[in-house]
């Protein structure tokens, strides 16, 4: 059996999959906040219960909101302070008596989608998450591309470029401070949170993403104008990412990926922001929803 764990700031989910990546079982527990040993033991207990339930020793893959530095072995997951800067793979492997692997949760999401039968025709798949934050993962020939250190795909920390700042009004452009220490990171613009903050600062009204989208479909002038601007901002930024990766397919996840208008508007908005010979790849909605992260984490032992 293949176990995938989604390690979040508020909950830890374990799911069990077979070789066809069909989910057979799942369990969620709260994430311990203050004690590292308790955090480790919570994961160990989840895995041991799965072993007992299925009568075998399963493989263990983790999806984390950050990455494990491949050179130092230390986790860089600042929003889970209890495990940040800790050798989580070593400590879990010792306690579980087996190898444990980890990848960024966006990489796991991309891997899950890339492994679907209908998507295996694409040699390269770019996964973009437009959720609480903005991030990405890149799958090459069925395997996650992690980079030298393990931080490949940290696309949320690319910054607004010339065209994006011009679109937002230069000196009047909202410039948001990022948790990474820099300013104007895409994480604060292309995420669901960024969608709401931009509407507030550009339109002077505080609304949820759902409320903005509802107004858009009702033909509200302010919402329509804002959504068109957001699509253009996304096209500028994703266009740069396409230029860097030239993917065969893009899959969108996270809350904003449920905004169906994006799949109509983005392919039309992208060409001016690409090189003349570039091709806009198919842009698809994620198939597995909230299960994508654990499914991709489980798949780490099918692909390495």
Swiss-Prot record:
Provide this UniProt record's keywords sorted from A to Z.
ATP-binding, Carbohydrate metabolism, Kinase, Metal-binding, Nucleotide-binding, Transferase, Zinc
InterPro entries membership: ATPase_NBD, N-acetyl-D-glucosamine_kinase, ROK, ROK_cs
Q: Which GO terms describe its molecular function?
A: ATP binding; N-acetylglucosamine kinase activity; zinc ion binding
Q: In which pathway does it act?
A: Cell wall biogenesis; peptidoglycan recycling
Quote the record's binding site residues for ATP. Answer: 4-11, 133-140
Per the UniProt record, which EC number(s) apply here?
Answer: 2.7.1.59
Any single biological process term in GO: peptidoglycan turnover
Task: Give me the reactions it catalyses.
Answer: N-acetyl-D-glucosamine + ATP = N-acetyl-D-glucosamine 6-phosphate + ADP + H(+)
Tell me the PROSITE patterns matching this sequence. Answer: ROK
- Which residues are listed for Zn(2+) binding in this entry? 157, 178, 180, 185
**HAMAP family according to UniProt:** GlcNAc_kinase
Role this protein plays: Catalyzes the phosphorylation of N-acetyl-D-glucosamine (GlcNAc) derived from cell-wall degradation, yielding GlcNAc-6-P.
Q: Which family does it belong to?
A: Belongs to the ROK (NagC/XylR) family. NagK subfamily.
This protein is called: N-acetyl-D-glucosamine kinase
Task: Write the gene name.
Answer: nagK
């Amino acid at each position: 059996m293949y176990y995938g764990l989604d390690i979040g700031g508020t909950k830890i989910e374990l799911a069990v999959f077979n070789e066809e990546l069909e989910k057979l079982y799942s369990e969620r527990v709260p994430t311990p906040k203050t004690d590292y040993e308790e955090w480790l033991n919570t994961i160990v207990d989840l895995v041991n219960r799965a072993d007992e339930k299925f009568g075998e020793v399963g493989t263990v893959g983790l999806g984390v909101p950050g990455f494990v530095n491949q050179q130092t072995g230390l986790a860089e997951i600042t929003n889970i302070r209890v495990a940040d800067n800790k050798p989580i793979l070593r400590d879990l492997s010792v306690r579980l008596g087996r190898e444990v692997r980890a990848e960024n949760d966006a990489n796991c999401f991309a891997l899950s989608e890339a492994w679907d039968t209908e998507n295996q025709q694409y040699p390269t798949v770019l996964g973009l998450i437009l959720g609480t934050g903005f991030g990405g993962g890149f799958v090459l020939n069925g395997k996650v591309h992690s980079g030298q250190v393990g931080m490949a795909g940290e696309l949320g920390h690319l910054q607004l470029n010339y065209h994006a700042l011009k679109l937002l009004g230069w000196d009047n452009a909202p410039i948001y401070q990022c948790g990474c220490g820099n300013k104007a990171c895409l994480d604060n613009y292309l995420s669901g949170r960024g969608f709401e903050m931009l509407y507030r600062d550009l339109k002077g009204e505080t609304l949820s993403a759902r409320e903005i989208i509802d107004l858009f479909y009702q033909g509200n002038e302010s919402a329509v104008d804002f959504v068109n601007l957001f699509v253009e901002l996304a096209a500028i930024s994703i266009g740069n990412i396409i230029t860097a990766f030239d993917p065969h397919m893009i899959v969108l996840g996270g809350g904003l990926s449920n905004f169906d208008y994006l799949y109509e508007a983005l392919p039309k908005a992208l060409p001016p922001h690409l090189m003349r010979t570039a091709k806009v790849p198919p842009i698809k909605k994620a198939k597995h929803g909230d299960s994508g992260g654990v499914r991709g984490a489980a798949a780490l032992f099918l692909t390495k």
